[in-house]
Structure formats: structure tokens, C-alpha cells
Amino acid sequence: MIGMDHFEREAYEDGYRVIAGVDEAGRGPLAGPVVAAAVILPHGYSHPEITDSKKLSAGKREKLYEVIKRDALAIGVGVVESPVIDQVNILRATLRAMAEAVDDLSIRPDFLLVDGLHRIFLNISQKTIVKGDTLSVSIASASIIAKVSRDRIMEIYHRQFPQYNFLKNKGYGTREHREAIQNFGFCKIHRRSFKVKSTKPQSLQTVNLFDF
């Protein structure tokens, strides 16, 4: 079994010096943004608890979020909201969020480890890794940053639209959420391209990622 730093070590051996892991959260929900994160960790970094954010409890993710913020050399976050998702489709929106996350880094990486199958539209050497959040500490760290950042955005949206209980479902298509859509229609952050019946939208206030 390979270690969580295998792909990082491989990149260092190939001569790269600044490696960023990139991952996203929120491709599947019916509402809210897709959020991506890019994380540059120190050379040789490891942490026994850092893994795919989906395998962690909310409390554990929050604790590891603070650990990663403390230990990382640089963190970048990209957010693409639902109107853009509807306009360009979820895959392109995800890749756009990933590119924004890399551009948001305070240090320019020379190599990217990207979760999934698709390369980011940036002129930087990169390797895509299916299930990379379980195989790379850099990608796993990015998955935690992306997930916690998105959850916090959805908590803000919950205060604007409490009838959908975004605090609990984070925009995913739970039974409760679908029933709320049937009862209240769409609000402004719902993804119209995700085939959920639309009624009159409500107003939307802008969410600032740095409000939390």
C-alpha cells in the first residue's frame, strides 16, 4: 500500500519544488456553489488523520481545517455560484473553481496534483489522480479546506433561506430538501440545470467567503 505522500515524493524526485493539491466540494448538490481548494504543504509533510473529507465527521473536519491552515505554506479557495454552474455546466464550473483556487495561492506552484480525471485549464504541469483525496495528503488537505469552506457558505445561505434547512442538508437532494422545493419553489441559489421543478425565485444576498 502506497503512503499518502507517494505522489508528492514522486513529483519531488522529478524535479518539482512547489506542489499543490487541488480538490472540490459541492458537485452534486441541488443548491449552492461548487467550491475548490488548493493547498501547498511543506516538503515531507504527513498527518495520520488527514484523508478524504467525506470520510470524516463534521467536527473532525473542522479540527483538521485548523491544522491545515496552521501547517500549510499556502491555501487558495475558488467559489463558483449556481448561476454560473447553470450557464457552463457543473464540470466546467468545477474546473473554473479549481483554477481560481490555484490562482488564489500566495505561492505559485510548479506542479499540481488534481483529484479526478480532468486537468485544470492552467499552464502548470499537473497529474490527475482518481480518488486522489484518499491517495495524496495534499489533495486530501484540499478536500477538507473545500468542504469546510463550502459548509460555512451554506450556513450563511441557511440564514437567508431557512425553509430549505441548508444548515443540515448543505444543498444536497435529501427528501426534506426536495419536499421544501415542492412547497416553496426554488430560491436564488438553486441550480436550475439540475432538473428540479422551478417556481418564482427569491432574492439573493451576496455571500462573502471571508465573512467567517
Curated annotation (Swiss-Prot):
GO molecular function: manganese ion binding; RNA binding; RNA-DNA hybrid ribonuclease activity
Enzyme Commission code(s) on record: 3.1.26.4
Top EC group: hydrolase
Binding site for a divalent metal cation: D23, E24, D115
UniProt cofactor(s): Mn(2+); Mg(2+)
A GO CC term assigned to this protein in UniProt: ribonuclease H2 complex
GO biological process: DNA replication, removal of RNA primer; mismatch repair
Location, primary (coarse class): cytoplasm
Keyword Hydrolase: yes
Reactions listed under catalytic activity: Endonucleolytic cleavage to 5'-phosphomonoester
Top-level taxon: Bacteria
PANTHER family attached to this UniProt entry: RIBONUCLEASE H2 SUBUNIT A, RIBONUCLEASE HII
Family in the record: Belongs to the RNase HII family.
This protein's name: Ribonuclease HII
